[in-house]
Amino acid sequence: MLYHVSPVAGLKTLQPRVSTHKVGYVYAIENLVTGLLFGAKWDDFDFILSTDKNGNPVICECYPDAFKSVYQGKTCSVYFLNDEGFQRNKTSWSEELVSENKVQVVEEHVITDLYNRLLDEEQNNKLIVHRYEYCTEYRKTISNHIVDRLIRFEIDLSNISESDNRFSKYFRAIVTELIQITDGHLLP
C-alpha cells in the first residue's frame, strides 16, 4: 500500500500534475509519516527533508518556528493507493514513487489536526524535527541550502523579497549578497 497526502479532501481519483519535475505525475510514498509532511503546503525554503538510517523522516527548520507555522491548524487527507503502476527512481528523491497515469483512491483517512499528529509521531520517534538553532554550524547548513535552492531553481532575486515574506523576514541578507555577487562586478 502506498500513500498520497494532500490538504484537499474528498478525492476519488488522483490525476497526474506537473510539478518541479516538469512531467505530469501522481506522487506517492511508502512511509506514512513522511507522507504526512506533505499534508500542508511547504517547500525547500521552509525545511530540509531527509531520512535517517531507519527510514524515518528528518526535517530541519530553515527559520524559527517553521514547523509550527506550516502545520499548526491544518487538516489533510491520507489517500491509500495500490502500488500498481508506480515507479521508483524517476525523480531525484529515492523515497518518492510516481505514476504517469491517473490513480484510483482505495481509501481516505482525514487528519483533523496535522500539527498534533506530527508532534505525536515525533514523540514516538517516527519523525525527527530539528528546530531552528542560532548556532554557527546550523545556520551555515541552512544558508548553504538556501543559496543552493535559489540558484538551482533560478529564482528571480530582484523580486523574491517582495513576493514571498519568508525572504524579506528571514533571508533578506542572503538575497542581497547574492544579487551583489552575481551582478558581474567581481569579474575582470
Identify the meaning behind each predicted range.
Residues K22, K41-P188:
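Conserved NAD+-utilizing ADP-ribose enzyme module
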Residues H4-G10, E30, L81-F86:
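Short, flexible beta-strand-to-coil junctions
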Residues M1, V26-Y27, C76-Y79:
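A broad, low-specificity signal marking well-ordered, structured residues that form hydrophobic/aromatic
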Residues K12, L36-L37, Q87-N89:
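Short catalytic/ligand-binding loop motif for oxyanion handling, primarily in non-cytosolic enzymes
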Residues M1-V23, A40:
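ADP-ribose/NAD+-binding catalytic cleft of ART/PARP-like enzymes
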Residues T20-D44:
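Extended catalytic/binding region for NAD+/ADP-ribose chemistry, centered on the ART fold
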